[in-house]
């Protein structure tokens, strides 16, 4: 917790230093006319991004909240460990790849969609090839790996990780490329629609699970299938946006 706080504090301090530097260098260009123009020009960012971020956080936390309420703390702890371990490559590798990719296509701009399409296809292919082996290992040997690494009592977390691995594989491919494309091509409304569909999919799964009185395993299987399809079609949508702009 202390490390997290220090890390966040360091990031905020650096942000304010950079902000101060840019403000001093560009304050002479600020005018009421420019403020009004850019407020209108980029109004879609706060209008769609803020609710999108809220829905993203809601759908991400929904599984733990549902399992804590319906199945108890022990099962929730097992799922928490499984999702945390599977999310590490998405957080580390996916975030770094996404930032580098975003910087490259932002430099190119949306006026060269053919070049962006080629780059995006190459990045998605490399992400898939890079992730297919580790996620396949978790899919087939997750319970054994978790038992060896964390102990016998975390065997069930390995089972859950095995179930969730297909969905997190599709998320690993989608996340790095989506932010760049949807921002560069100014499709902020699409971001909101994608997050709405994820929330609806998530709550539909848990609603069915509750009505049918499913076990945690069956619930996670449907959840993993649902979100795998969600990210598959969301990735297709990203490529469709580029093609449509050609």
For each feature predicted by the language model, list its residue ranges.
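Interhelical loop/hinge segments that connect adjacent transmembrane helices in multipass membrane
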Residues: 3-4, 9-60, 104, 110-118, ...
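Interfacial transmembrane-helix starts/ends
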Residues: 43, 113-129, 136-140, 158-161
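Helix-loop interface residues and adjacent transmembrane-helix termini in multi-pass membrane transporters
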Residues: 70-73, 184-185, 213
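Membrane-interface junctions at transmembrane-helix termini in multi-pass inner-membrane proteins
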Residues: 166-196, 240
């Amino acid at each position: 917790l202390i490390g997290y706080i220090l890390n966040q504090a360091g990031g905020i301090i650096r942000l304010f230093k950079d902000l101060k530097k840019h403000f001093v260098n560009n304050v002479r260009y600020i005018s009421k006319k420019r403020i009004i123009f850019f407020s209108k020009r980029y109004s879609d960012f706060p209008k769609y991004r803020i609710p999108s971020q809220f829905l993203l956080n809601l759908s991400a936390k929904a599984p733990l909240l549902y399992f804590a309420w319906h199945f108890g703390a022990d099962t929730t702890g097992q799922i928490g460990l499984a999702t945390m371990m599977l999310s590490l490559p998405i957080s580390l590798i996916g975030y770094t790849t996404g930032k580098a990719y975003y910087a490259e296509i932002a430099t190119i701009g949306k006026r060269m969609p053919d070049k962006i399409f080629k780059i995006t296809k190459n990045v998605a292919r490399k992400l898939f090839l890079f992730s297919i082996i580790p996620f396949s290992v978790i899919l087939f040997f997750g319970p054994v790996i978790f038992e060896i690494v964390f102990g016998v009592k975390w065997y069930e977390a390995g089972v859950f990780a095995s179930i969730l691995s297909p969905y997190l594989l599709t998320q690993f491919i989608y996340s790095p490329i989506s932010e760049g494309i949807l921002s560069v091509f100014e499709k902020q409304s699409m971001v909101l629609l994608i997050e709405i569909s994820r929330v609806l999919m998530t709550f539909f799964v848990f609603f069915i699970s509750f009505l049918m009185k499913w076990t945690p395993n069956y619930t996670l299987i449907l959840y993993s299938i649902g979100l795998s399809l969600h990210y598959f079609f969301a990735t297709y949508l990203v490529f469709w946006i580029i093609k449509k702009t050609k």
